[in-house]
């Protein structure tokens, strides 16, 4: 474990805490209709091939290309229509390989038939009992969805830890799954600290600010599939904070605070955390987001509840949640961590940078004449400037060891939109 009170790189900090976090929630069985947004507790394997039989991919005529290829195929074929196959009402009986079957999209292809000719390429007799067409460009299995083409029986349809999206709901339904085993939703307690913080909608005392962090963090928690527990605002009092943190740890799987983690006289979080449990690290070598505490709150039975003390400035709280807290919560909840989408871009202008910390700068993205991304660093980079975060397309990542960067330097940009 690195020195808890020396600034940690983002990677070192994430490793220090995530390596000691393991899945902590139990599994439960729920109806598929209620499973959206939840995380699978175990792999789901398909009980059968999907589709179960070869199906036509379009309206037309099914026939045996392999049988007819034995004849002279330079001339148009003239075949007798011997039956019909519709979706849900397949052709039954013997399909004469010297003839063809009228078939519609989604209908089962008769056994022994291995191609479908689109109806627009077919000429029909007045009675519809005879058709004529050329097989030019038609290969075996043309316009046929083969059995197991979407997913084979016994194959893993969705892996454990997958978040169940609308598309995943459709896949599970297509293989006949009506009940799924998912992880219980992770419960995350959220509270703000500080005498200067007030709830939105109420009066704003002189020198106070409305609490933007708690709503921000609760929405970020929901976005990763966990359930936030709103514990309100705790004033700058060590005993009160200790009481609230103990309570939070008793009802939640993880605890997040914002504010109270710098070195001000009224910032009690560090001392309280040391009295309640242990601290993995206290500072990050990043900007914004340097003052971030992470550790565990211990209870009397020896259980440990992960704790994250985020900075009071909203942009710093956002950056530290995305870089540290979110991945740890996903691991805790049994989810497969999802990395934030990233693009490679070039700086639109030279940018100042101090070696020894990773910087996350709000930026706008445009395409240059060659179609490559260009990152224009926003003028406002204050850690309290929420509007600049809303307006940004992404966060330009300036590497830990880099110094000043020249115009055109290649960087990663974490996408926000």
Task: For the regions a language model picked out, list residue spans one by one.
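Structural signal for hydrophobic packing residues in well-ordered secondary-structure cores
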Residues: 18-25, 43, 109, 155-161, ...
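Conserved active-site and cofactor/substrate-binding residues in soluble primary-metabolism enzymes
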Residues: 5-12, 27-30, 34, 58, ...
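Residue-level signal for inorganic ion chemistry
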Residues: 17, 60, 154, 190, ...
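Short, low-complexity N-terminal leaders and the immediately following helix N-cap/first helix
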Residues: 1-73, 102, 146, 335-360
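Helix-rich terminal scaffold detector
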Residues: 2-11, 178-310, 314-320, 331
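Flexible glycine/proline-rich
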Residues: 14, 28-33, 42, 88, ...
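Short, glycine/charged-enriched hinge/interface segments at domain edges or termini
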Residues: 2-5, 62-230, 235, 374, ...
């Amino acid at each position: 474990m690195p020195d808890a009170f020396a600034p940690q790189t983002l990677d070192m900090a994430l490793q220090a805490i995530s390596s000691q976090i393991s899945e902590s929630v139990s599994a439960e069985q729920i109806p598929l209709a209620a499973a959206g947004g939840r995380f699978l507790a175990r792999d789901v394997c398909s009980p059968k091939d999907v589709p179960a039989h070869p199906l036509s991919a379009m309206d037309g005529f099914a026939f045996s290309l392999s049988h007819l290829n034995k004849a002279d195929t330079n001339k148009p074929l003239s075949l007798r229509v011997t039956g019909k196959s519709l979706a849900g009402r397949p052709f039954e009986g013997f399909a004469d390989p010297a003839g063809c079957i009228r078939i519609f999209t989604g209908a089962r292809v008769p056994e022994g038939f291995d191609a479908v000719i689109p109806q627009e390429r077919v000429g029909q007799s007045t009675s519809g009992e005879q058709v004529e067409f050329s097989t030019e460009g038609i290969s075996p299995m043309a316009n046929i969805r083969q059995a197991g083409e979407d997913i084979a029986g016994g194959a893993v349809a969705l892996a454990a830890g997958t978040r169940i999206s609308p598309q995943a709901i459709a896949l599970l339904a297509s293989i006949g799954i009506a009940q799924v085993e998912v992880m219980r939703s992770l419960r995350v307690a959220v509270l703000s600290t500080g005498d200067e913080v007030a709830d939105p909608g109420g009066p704003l005392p002189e020198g106070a600010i409305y609490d933007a962090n708690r709503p921000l963090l609760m929405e970020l928690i929901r976005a990763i599939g966990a359930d936030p527990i709103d514990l309100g605002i705790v004033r700058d009092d060590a005993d009160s904070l200790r009481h609230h943190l103990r309570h939070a740890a008793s009802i939640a799987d993880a605890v997040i605070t914002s504010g109270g983690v710098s070195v001000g006289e009224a910032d009690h979080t560090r001392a309280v955390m040391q009295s309640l449990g242990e601290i993995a690290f206290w500072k990050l070598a990043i900007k914004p987001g340097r003052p971030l505490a992470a550790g565990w709150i211990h209870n009397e039975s020896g259980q440990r509840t992960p704790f994250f003390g985020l900075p009071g400035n909203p942009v710093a709280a956002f950056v530290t949640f995305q870089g540290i807290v979110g991945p740890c919560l996903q691991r805790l909840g049994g989810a497969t961590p999802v990395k934030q989408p990233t693009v490679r871009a070039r700086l639109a202008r030279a940018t100042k940078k101090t070696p020894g910390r990773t910087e996350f700068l709000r930026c706008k993205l445009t395409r240059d004449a060659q179609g490559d991304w260009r990152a224009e660093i926003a003028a406002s980079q204050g850690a309290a400037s929420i509007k600049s975060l809303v307006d940004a397309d992404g966060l330009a990542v300036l590497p830990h060891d880099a110094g000043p960067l020249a115009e055109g330097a290649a960087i990663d940009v974490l996408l926000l939109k």
